[in-house]
Regions:
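Structural/interface elements that position substrates and couple domains in central-metabolism enzymes
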Residues: 1-440
Length: 440
């Protein structure tokens, strides 16, 4: 099947590459010439495990191409996936200008039937705006060309996006006409050979499903973080509590790990957008408002623990950081807890020496003008002469360190673990002072 993907960012590039990998003929469009030049020269502009190999394989096979030419992309595919950004506006609502612009470009250039598929995360009612933009552009041309609009939200986890796309737990299709549904069913047939994963529903329900899923996961994170803070106060161990409640099959263990808050490109933005959608509809989501407030506060937990132990004035002190990305297996630092911690430490006069296996280049871009941040080549090098270590991201390589070596390299044998990676007894037996989240 011929497919066009408008937007060669995270969602668009992963979707286009995976669809090409099962035999489709895919063209990815982006208005960013540098991004397309990078892709056409064999580079990958984002870090995602497995993406480089799948892109190169399908480019070589001739099934995946990249362009900045809108007319070429619109002419190519019967399926036109819109996978552009929907950044938060000042009021928290999703900014749909890029989605609507993509729809208008399709309307200006289409010559035959198209299925326009919203792949971007968008609020309820966006399909109506897409449909209106298409209709206006066709009317301006005096063209009577049929089209369908479909909602097909993505459920990709950064760091596991290829696996999520190739082996989905569900495929949500929101559509109101049989022709579009049949084309989408044909498209996704290779991804559901073992069992039926395709859920068809009306468009508004599909649009809400994506936001609802992310909001539910964010709620679990904030709830566990709140419980961890209570455990800190009461002297309970949140790890034992987690095991006790997670063993209940009605609850389970997914997203039940306390820490220092969620970040990234999805949860913060989508929670804010759903809160705004609900408020505009006259049905405010009080629970979700609390979730967002709790997450914002949780990002200050690690700075607070450091200040309680070392004092408010950190001038002359160096804090080592393990982890910069908002989660493992990505270089994404958007809304990352590390940024809150770094900014607090710098304001208090500290120096920072950070290590991250993937996100260092992104951190150097963000903090290019900050001379008090240094970057280490490996985890242990970050510890040399540091007054404390703060663990911010739960990369696997941090899970089994040599605690004796850590103690020897730290100026002050002090660890603040924002991800509860260790049994507290283990670093303490090595002579390290260890502070975690909700653990005595």
């Amino acid at each position: 099947m011929k497919i066009s993907v408008i937007g060669a960012g995270y969602v668009g590039l992963v979707s286009g590459a995976c669809l090409a990998d099962v035999g489709n003929d895919v063209v990815c469009l982006d208005v960013d010439h540098r991004k397309i030049d990078t892709l056409n020269s064999g580079g990958i502009p984002i870090h995602e495990p497995g993406l480089d190999a799948i892109v190169k394989r399908n480019v070589v096979a001739g099934r995946l191409r990249f362009t900045t030419d809108i007319e070429t992309a619109v002419a190519h595919g019967v399926l036109q996936f819109i996978a552009v950004g929907t950044p938060p506006d000042e009021d928290g609502s999703a900014d749909l200008q890029y989605v609507v612009a993509a729809a208008r470009n399709i309307g200006r250039h289409m010559q035959d039937y198209k299925v326009v598929v919203d792949k971007s995360t968008v609020p309820v009612g966006t399909a109506d705006k897409v449909r209106l933009a298409l209709a206006e552009e066709l009317a301006a041309r005096g063209a009577a060309i049929p089209y369908s609009v479909v909602s097909n939200p993505e459920f990709l986890k950064e760091g596991a996006a290829i696996e999520d796309f190739m082996k989905p737990d569900r495929i949500v299709i929101g559509a109101d006409d049989a022709r579009a549904i049949e084309l989408m069913r044909e498209l996704y047939a290779p991804f559901q050979r073992n069992r039926e994963r395709l859920l068809t529903m009306d468009i508004k329900s599909a649009e809400l499903t994506k936001y609802a899923a992310n909001a539910m996961l964010a709620t679990r994170i904030s709830f566990m973080n709140e419980l961890a803070n209570l455990a800190d106060t009461l002297g309970a161990d949140i790890e034992l509590v987690r095991q006790g409640i997670g063993s209940d099959p009605r609850i389970g263990f997914h997203f039940l790990y306390p820490g220092i808050g969620y970040g990234g490109s999805c949860f913060p933005k989508d929670v804010q957008a759903l809160i705004r959608t609900a408020t505009d509809a006259g049905q405010p989501l009080q629970v979700l408002q609390a979730v967002e407030a709790a997450n914002h506060a949780q990002k200050s937990i690690l700075p607070r623990k450091i200040v309680q132990r070392l004092g408010a004035d950190l001038g002359g002190k160096t804090i080592a950081l393990w982890g910069l990305a908002f989660k493992p297996n990505t270089d994404d630092m958007r809304e990352a807890p590390s940024r809150v911690l770094i900014e607090d430490l710098l304001q208090r006069g500290a120096r920072v020496c950070a290590y991250d296996p993937v996100a260092t280049a992104e951190a150097k871009r963000i903090y290019a003008d900050e001379p008090r941040i240094a970057f280490a080549a490996n985890p242990m090098a970050a510890l040399d002469g540091a007054d404390a270590l703060a663990i911010v991201t739960e990369w696997k390589e941090f899970r089994s360190p040599d605690f004796a070596a850590m103690r020897a390299r730290l100026k002050n044998p002090l660890i603040f673990d924002g991800r509860n990676l260790y049994n507290p007894a283990t670093p303490r037996q090595a002579g390290l002072e260890y502070h975690a989240i909700g653990r005595p």
